[in-house]
Amino acid sequence: MTARLIVMDIDSTLINQEVIDLLGEEAGVGEQVARITERAMRGELDFKQALEERVELLAGLDKSVFERTFTRVTFTPGALELVRSAHSKGWKVGVVSGGFHEVADKIVAAADIDFCLANHLEVVDGKLTGKLAADIVTKESKLIQLLDWAVGCGVDMAHTVAIGDGANDIPMIQAAGTGIAFCAKPKTREAAPFTIDERNLMLAMDIILRD
């Protein structure tokens, strides 16, 4: 069977929530953060600037917030089945996220996902500082990681799959052999070769095997 690589976004794709919005709720600024998130995902705001603005609002949160936030996360219907199905075929699965390793790593472990790229939040003396600890994961970063993982796995780009919902997923969706907009924002839907409008990630397998 042909070796393949599936790369997905996390927030609103692999899971039903936007982790940064959940963190915003913990900080008492949930609505403000959610409004910025929605505009950023629609491509109406510069993603880097929008992320920095939202992270600033999280300053002062205790690092215990990561575990609490993870307990509120639910996987999208079909997500775990898609990962298991891919692994049963010998395929690899990775996630690329503008979210945060502090929660993403727990999600990845629970879903048995092979690779993960995400942002790191700066924590000093057990508290979030409101800053990021490393370079921001951008739409360009997501694309580059897809390309790097494909090379590392020995998978031809024609046999890669990219799935996402936001404007920052468009470059990887367009570069992959099979690019899927999943319950996506209008700008992403228009840019994607394939779309799924039902919250069932196993529908992606039908597209992959048909393509």
Per-range role (PLM):
Residues 1-121, 125, 199:
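Alpha-helical substrate-recognition element adjacent to the catalytic core
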Residues 70-211:
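C-terminal cap/substrate-recognition subdomain and adjoining C-terminal extension
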